């Protein structure tokens, strides 16, 4: 059996990291840096739900029409030319993500991506528990709703997008509730995952914490 240290540093070996946590907890920043450090493909699983949400809006599909949403999820194709970083799209994505058949359909694509990509770090809500339960390293990142709302607000402001902090806070609280209470793939740490609360940590400190954890696991 190939040891974890070899998997991490030998780019000829398969190496998978699952990176889970609630919205705006710092997963994206950490994931991109770790991907570069260990020569991994980085994939944000929420993009498939945002793409589906965009398609529902574009095709004027009422998301309360469960059968129509499920049918659309079976033929999903990603369009990299679309800006999906929109709070309205994110809110709809959160609502349709609670539909079990939608998650099952989209997870088939994610599971296949993990299996066919030798070196990958996949970010999401249920990667370590459902999509990649056999990941070599499992990380769960969290932070208080207020801190996460501030981060999302600053991200959107930096992109020149109009947003209201109080609305973002309420959206995050509601998304957390949906994520934790859904029947399929609820948000929770995978067994054996490294759990880190980033509420009082900067992006650099978060990366240092995770990197130190990885170093301890592979030495």
Swiss-Prot record:
Catalytic activity: CMP + ATP = CDP + ADP; dCMP + ATP = dCDP + ADP
Domain of life assignment: Bacteria
Keyword Nucleotide-binding (UniProt): yes
Residues reported to bind ATP: 21-29
The UniProt record lists the keyword Protein transport: no
Intracellular or extracellular location(s): Cytoplasm
Enzyme Commission no: 2.7.4.25
GO cellular component terms listed in the entry, alphabetical order: cytoplasm
Gene Ontology biological process terms in this record: pyrimidine nucleotide metabolic process
Principal subcellular localization: cytoplasm
Gene Ontology molecular functions: ATP binding; CMP kinase activity; dCMP kinase activity
Record's keyword terms, sorted: ATP-binding, Cytoplasm, Kinase, Nucleotide-binding, Transferase
Family the UniProt entry places it in: Belongs to the cytidylate kinase family. Type 1 subfamily.
Protein name, UniProt field: Cytidylate kinase
Organism: Rickettsia prowazekii (strain Madrid E)
Gene this protein is translated from: cmk
